Amino acid sequence: MSEPRKLEVLRAIVEDYVHSREPVGSKALVERHHLGVSSATIRNDMAALEDEGLITAPHTSAGRIPTDKGYRLFVDQISAVKPLSQAERRAIQSLLEGSDDLDDVLDRTVRLLSQLTNQVAVVQYPHLSRALIRHIEFVLLAPRKVLVVLIANSGNVEQRVIDVGQDLADDALSALRTRFLGTLAGTPLARLAQALPAVVSSVSPGERQAAQALAHALEILAHSSREDRMVMAGTANLARSNVDFPLSIGPVLEALEEQVVMLRLLSDMAQDHRGVAVSIGRENPYDGLAEASVVATGYGPDSVAKIGILGPTRMDYPNTMAAVRAVARYLSRILGP
């Protein structure tokens, strides 16, 4: 069997199995695809593909299904990620625009990607090692109670209510906010802790206790902003794909619940020349994802943070890759540089 025909037969098997969920036989391939050869020749071709470990027979079925190795060869032969339709692009644009709140943008993003792919969608919060302080706000709730708000240029908003240890008037708190913001605006979050002592020491002794409490709160908020987190949507799609996880869907749900597993996997996935990364079945380092595939890409500055989907290995890879990459590009555009 020639290499082009091998790839053509494999492609036909993958496409039929993805859409039908049924093992694929030689007769069905001849009827549905213009392969230009007889059913007997296709049977021989399928036997050769099985010998190479690219397809396998589930139980005693007469048909064949792709293996992880077969899916990998199929995915690697996708020369370029196809663009989405104009209607799909308009839908993405209209759903993602119109919000400046990072949490809202990411929540919309995963819900949209889940709807486009019928898979579980996940997105890492932006990596904030280079994020800068855009705004600081202190709101007096009671004479000693203050709401501290820290906003980064990435869109992250962190807030915390603290006891400043002394009574403060509105004008005194406003003066402290002006001093903190005037000194710290534009400071990288990663360097905030080193910059705070100078601000505190510049405050009059009578307000230094409050200034120290405010500085401590800002340091905690900056640390919270830099923690690796993710948001996801579409776990119900896994339940509808229960047949695709013959061993158990439990380990897949556990991997999603244990965010550290997904975050580590996303961080380790390297994009290829098409701008996406695909990890199939047992290629995943976590055993619980042996029956799942992950398609991801980077977004934002330097494409460090990842967005992607998780689903069964029986997946429409071309359309999924296109949706992931398109949504990532719109997300990058909305969040800006």
UniProtKB/Swiss-Prot annotation:
InterPro entries associated with the record: DeoR_HTH, GAF-like_dom_sf, HrcA, HrcA_C, WH-like_DNA-bd_sf, WH_DNA-bd_sf, WHTH_transcript_rep_HrcA_IDD
Recorded superkingdom: Bacteria
Keywords: Repressor, Stress response, Transcription, Transcription regulation
Coiled-coil annotated spans: none
GO BP term, example: negative regulation of DNA-templated transcription
GO MF terms, alphabetically ordered: DNA binding; DNA-binding transcription factor activity
Keyword Cell membrane annotated: no
Pfam families recorded: HrcA, HTH_DeoR
HAMAP family: HrcA (MF_00081)
Described purpose of this protein according to its UniProt entry: Negative regulator of class I heat shock genes (grpE-dnaK-dnaJ and groELS operons). Prevents heat-shock induction of these operons.
Family statement: Belongs to the HrcA family.
NCBIfam families, per database record: hrcA
Protein name stated in the entry: Heat-inducible transcription repressor HrcA
